[in-house]
Amino acid sequence: MQVLVRDNNVDQALKALKKKMQREGIFREMKLRGHYEKPSEKKAREKAEAVRRARKLARKKLQREGLLPMKPKPVFGAGPGGDRRGPGAGPGAGPRPAR
């Protein structure tokens, strides 16, 4: 697997490499091959994964048809460490004081 390093920017190249590896499923493969998996365990795991995929597919289909409510979209700006001052946000839940 090759990644182009532009302007000696190794951090960006590493990020691109990790993204490629993630897409290819290399990390998942490494995790699975980290220890021996008995054939019966492998069969059970693959069956569970297939059931999970089928359930997810059925849920998506029902959502598209309008029979199930859609998953709420995340509100941007209130992520980790962000400003979450809403109802019941604790003492002094008003606007943030200026610095």
From Swiss-Prot:
Biological process terms in GO annotation: translation
Tagged with keyword Ribosomal protein: yes
Pfam families from the UniProt entry: Ribosomal_S21 (PF01165)
GO CC, alphabetical: ribonucleoprotein complex; ribosome
Domain of life: Bacteria
Keyword Ribosomal protein part of the UniProt annotation: yes
InterPro entries the UniProt entry points to: Ribosomal_bS21, Ribosomal_bS21_CS, Ribosomal_bS21_sf
Family, similarity comment: Belongs to the bacterial ribosomal protein bS21 family.
UniProt-listed NCBIfam families: S21p
This protein's name: Small ribosomal subunit protein bS21
Organism: Rhodopseudomonas palustris (strain BisA53)
